Design a protein with these regions (language model features):
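Short, low-complexity, Pro/Ser/Thr/Gly-rich segments in the mature regions of secreted, periplasmic
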Residues: 141-148
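Bacterial N-terminal signal peptides that target proteins for export
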Residues: 1-21
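Short, surface-exposed ligand-recognition loops at beta-strand->loop->(often short) alpha-helix junctions
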Residues: 49-58
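A short, glycine/Asx- and small/polar-enriched loop/turn
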Residues: 87-93
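An amphipathic, aromatic/His-enriched active-site/gating alpha helix that lines ligand/cofactor pockets
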Residues: 11, 25, 32-38, 59-77, ...
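N-terminal signal peptide c-region/cleavage motif recognized by signal peptidases
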Residues: 17, 28-29
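Active-site-flanking beta-strand signature of metal-NTP-handling nucleotidyl enzymes
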Residues: 42-46, 94
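Short, solvent-exposed loop/turn elements at beta->coil junctions and helix N-caps
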Residues: 80-85
């Protein structure tokens, strides 16, 4: 399955999960990668776990990552997994973060990556081997008609 296909499937799963929860999201790609729009941005991230490691990934997020994201200024919006096997149910985590700006996102990710608490949690969660096979990230701007901005 290609990276684009996984991203599209992840986004469709996110939308389906949001719809089931009574939420409505509308996304648009940034106009220019070279010049990010000012203001709040969303980041859609898709993690593909190594075979049999999704539970370990979910545990790491549940017990450590969400709190660390918040500590470093990232807003946890929604965390989802696909419902169907063909969409990566066994190994895929898709989540949405909100950042004050694209620059703030960069600063938050740098601080998160350098946080000794994160390094300890990551190393402990990988004591039985690596967890993540791949990560994709897409920054999104809400449209002018999006109920969530």
């Amino acid at each position: 399955m290609t990276r684009f296909t996984r991203l599209a499937l992840g986004l469709s799963g996110l939308i389906a999960s949001a719809s089931a929860a009574g939420l409505a999201f509308t996304f648009a790609a940034p106009a220019s990668a070279a010049k990010p729009a000012p203001g709040r941005v969303f980041e859609l991230r898709t993690y593909v776990a190594l075979p049999g490691r999704l539970d370990a990934l979910n545990t790491r997020f549940r017990e450590h990552t969400l709190a660390l994201f918040k500590k470093h200024g990232m807003e946890n919006v929604v965390y989802t997994t696909p419902q169907d096997d063909k969409d990566g149910k066994a190994d895929t985590l898709v989540y949405l973060l909100a950042h004050k700006s694209r620059d703030a996102a960069k600063e938050s990710w740098t601080a998160f990556g350098n946080d000794p608490v994160w390094k300890t949690a990551r190393d402990a969660s990988e004591k039985d081997g690596k967890i993540v096979k791949s990560v994709t990230s897409v920054f999104l701007d809400p449209t002018d008609y999006s109920p969530m901005k």
